[in-house]
Amino acid sequence: MLTWALTFFVLGVIAAVFGFGGVIGVAASIAKVIFLLCVAFVVLFSVLAFKQHKRHK
């Protein structure tokens, strides 16, 4: 999933140079969604790992 996020990020940067038009603008939107999902998963799993670590002490 992170590979796709990086791919769409690169396409999004290229789109920014050319003004976010057409299909590339859609790629930038997809990159934002994938990035936010990855951040949400990192936060979720960090909280779960912290709780599990605290429980086993």
From Swiss-Prot:
> What is the annotated localization of this protein?
Cell membrane
Which HAMAP family did the record assign? Answer: UPF0391 (MF_01361)
The signal peptide here is none
Q: Write down a Pfam family by its short name.
A: DUF1328
Q: InterPro entries, from UniProt? A: DUF1328
| Bilayer-crossing regions | 8-28, 30-50
Family, according to the entry, reads as follows: Belongs to the UPF0391 family.
Its cellular-component GO annotations read: plasma membrane
The record gives the membrane topology as:
Multi-pass membrane protein
Q: State the protein's name.
A: UPF0391 membrane protein Patl_0263
List keywords of the entry alphabetically.
Cell membrane, Membrane, Transmembrane, Transmembrane helix
* Chief localization: membrane
